[in-house]
């Protein structure tokens, strides 16, 4: 028997075909969507996956959006794009690192890859291109850094004698600073402490580096120190002269600022060079070094007259002035900025000031001055210092870095010779790490037994990390402790009631408070300071 299809079989086949087509289309669309998502995830992990970032405008890139407070702009972008993102300043692509994880992965785990500096015009100006801080990363640079670090520690914190000399310098300048502040606040007056503090800190570094100090009214010294702000503004992250070199081609404010920057550097270099030449002339062969300049000169001369078969290491004579310029310039600016912030915080948080003074009185007493050996027994004083550095983050963004090889950070590809900005502020104000990071609370650094939480204290990022970590970090922390301990032990600091509570700041390499006034008064008298300095002078005369 023959078998035949029913009359409606073609329609049934047509309906089935349509359903299959629709189903196939749906499956295809879903497959394409999933494939696209998978490819996107894979693409982000591929070497050609650059960090995301905002749209850059022609010619200027994102420069107009950065603003004065670049660290806050970077933090806002990090919330949108993640801890690793890219902006463009002029024609220069810049990768910005935020957060402890990204920064640690780059600067610590890949220290050598992120240790270079960009070939910026302003960097070439500093110390005639011989600067350690601004110089290119190389084997020679590493030798110079080791020599500079070793000599610096030898004249500051390594040996008991050098620590004693450093404490003596700090004591003498603290005594002079207190005298100036109290005298200018006579009769209930208020003063801006900026200039006296800059001179006091610079005098300590001058004694360490050059073996001399200056009066608080020395016009030449004051002029030399008055340009810290302009210097920081030119070399800080986002400086237009470095990312838009075409601005040098015609008259404009940026070119004017850069030419002033060149003159500031010439003046500073000439100041140090004069010290260098005088030291070479007066240096007695075989004598112990009088200061850091002597030590560098002796080290360089030893290298120059060494066995030709030995591998060269240390500093050349022509490197000495630039190295001293780095140490003196960076230390006095960083320390004076930090000390100004400490005094501001004392006046803004009088309960904190009172607690610092109470701990000093309990541990040190009122019949002597604080010294470095007291530091382990003053946890709240140290907590105040750590919280001040975290809260202010007065060095919010490091000097620009550059990569020496192709690399990855958090899965993003960063090619060789990329300019990299490191946002230290983002680490110090990360709400995932710090409870209520916008609150000033020194007690956060104390454990349940009242001791310093060392793990938390080491998380504060102010002197950078990795190969470019500041060689003066230990010296800076030592001097900050000595200055603020002596000042708090001897003085009371009060805010000017006629000034508004909100403050304005200048932004550059560091965040500096603009002009402000405070009232400074003695807790007792100058007798203890005077007798301590007299005793120190008598001991020096006997040596």
From Swiss-Prot:
InterPro entries: Cyt_P450 (IPR001128), Cyt_P450_CS (IPR017972), Cyt_P450_E_grp-I (IPR002401), Cyt_P450_sf (IPR036396). Coiled coil: none annotated. It is a peripheral membrane protein. Its EC number is 1.14.14.1, 4.2.1.152. Keywords: Endoplasmic reticulum, Fatty acid metabolism, Heme, Iron, Lipid metabolism, Lyase, Membrane, Metal-binding, Microsome, Mitochondrion, Monooxygenase, Oxidoreductase, Steroid metabolism. GO terms for cellular component: endoplasmic reticulum membrane; intracellular membrane-bounded organelle; mitochondrion. One of its GO terms (biological process) is response to indole-3-methanol. It is found in: Endoplasmic reticulum membrane; Microsome membrane; Mitochondrion. Its cofactor is heme. CDD domains: CYP1B1-like. Induction: By polycyclic aromatic hydrocarbons (PAH), beta-naphthoflavone and 2,3,7,8-tetrachlorodibenzo-p-dioxin (TCDD). Up-regulated by diesel exhaust particles (DEP). Decreased by estradiol (at protein level). The keyword Calcium does not apply. Enzyme activity is increased by cytochrome b5. Enzyme activity is increased by liposomes containing anionic phospholipids, phosphatidic acid and cardiolipin. Inhibited by naringenin with an IC(50) of 5 uM. The record marks 395 as: Major determinant of CYP1B1 17beta-estradiol hydroxylation regiospecificity. The keyword Endoplasmic reticulum applies. A cytochrome P450 monooxygenase involved in the metabolism of various endogenous substrates, including fatty acids, steroid hormones and vitamins. Mechanistically, uses molecular oxygen inserting one oxygen atom into a substrate, and reducing the second into a water molecule, with two electrons provided by NADPH via cytochrome P450 reductase (NADPH--hemoprotein reductase). Exhibits catalytic activity for the formation of hydroxyestrogens from 17beta-estradiol (E2), namely 2- and 4-hydroxy E2. Metabolizes testosterone and progesterone to B or D ring hydroxylated metabolites. Belongs to the cytochrome P450 family. This is Cytochrome P450 1B1. It comes from Rattus norvegicus. The lineage of its organism: Eukaryota, Metazoa, Chordata, Craniata, Vertebrata.
């Amino acid at each position: 028997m023959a078998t035949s299809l029913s009359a409606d079989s073609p329609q049934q086949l047509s309906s089935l075909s349509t359903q299959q087509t629709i189903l196939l289309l749906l499956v295809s669309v879903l497959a394409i969507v999933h494939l696209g998502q998978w490819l996107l995830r894979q693409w982000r992990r591929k070497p050609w996956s650059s960090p995301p970032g905002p749209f850059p405008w022609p010619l200027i890139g994102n420069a107009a959006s950065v603003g004065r407070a670049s660290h806050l702009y970077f933090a806002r972008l990090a919330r949108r794009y993640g801890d690793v993102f890219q902006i463009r300043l002029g024609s220069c692509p810049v990768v910005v690192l935020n957060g402890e994880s990204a920064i640690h992965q780059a600067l610590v785990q890949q220290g050598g890859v992120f240790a270079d500096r960009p070939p910026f015009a302003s960097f070439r100006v500093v110390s005639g291109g011989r600067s350690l801080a601004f110089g290119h990363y190389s084997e020679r640079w590493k030798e110079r850094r080791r020599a500079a670090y070793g000599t610096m520690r030898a004249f500051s914190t390594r040996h008991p004698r050098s620590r004693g000399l450093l404490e003596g310098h700090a004591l003498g300048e603290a005594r002079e600073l207190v005298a100036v502040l109290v005298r200018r606040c006579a009769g209930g007056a208020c003063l801006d402490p900026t200039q006296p503090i800059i001179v006091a800190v610079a005098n300590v570094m001058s004694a360490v580096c050059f073996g001399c100090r200056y009066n608080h009214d020395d016009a030449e010294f004051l002029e030399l120190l008055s340009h810290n702000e302009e210097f920081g503004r030119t070399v800080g992250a986002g400086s237009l002269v470095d990312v838009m070199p075409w601005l040098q081609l015609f008259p404009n404010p940026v070119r004017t600022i850069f030419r002033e920057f060149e003159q500031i550097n010439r003046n500073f270099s000439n100041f140090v060079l004069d010290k260098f030449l005088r030291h070479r002339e007066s240096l007695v062969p075989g004598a112990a070094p009088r200061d850091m300049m002597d030590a560098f000169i002796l080290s360089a001369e030893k290298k120059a007259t060494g066995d030709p078969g030995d591998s060269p290491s240390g500093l050349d004579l022509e490197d000495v002035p630039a190295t001293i310029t780095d140490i003196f310039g960076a230390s006095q600016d960083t320390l004076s900025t930090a000390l100004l912030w400490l005094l501001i915080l004392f006046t803004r948080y009088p309960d904190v000031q009172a607690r610092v003074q109470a701990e000093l009185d309990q541990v040190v007493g009122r019949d002597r001055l604080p010294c470095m050996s007291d530091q382990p027994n003053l946890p709240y004083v140290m907590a105040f210092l750590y919280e001040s550095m975290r809260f202010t983050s007065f060095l919010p963004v490091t000097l620009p870095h550059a990569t020496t090889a192709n690399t990855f950070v958090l899965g993003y590809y960063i090619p060789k010779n990329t300019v990299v900005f490191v946002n230290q502020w983002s680490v110090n104000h990360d709400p995932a790490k710090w409870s209520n990071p916008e609150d000033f609370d020194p007690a956060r650094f104390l454990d349940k037994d009242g001791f310093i939480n060392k793990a938390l204290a080491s998380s504060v990022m102010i002197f950078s990390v990795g190969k470019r970590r500041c060689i003066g970090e230990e010296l800076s922390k030592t001097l900050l402790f000595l200055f603020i301990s002596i000042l708090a032990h001897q003085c009371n600091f009060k805010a000017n009631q006629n000034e508004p509570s909100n403050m304005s700041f200048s932004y550059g390499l560091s965040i500096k408070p603009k002009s402000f006034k405070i009232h400074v008064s003695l807790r007792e008298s100058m007798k203890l300071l005077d007798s301590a300095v007299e005793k120190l002078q008598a001991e020096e005369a006997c040596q």
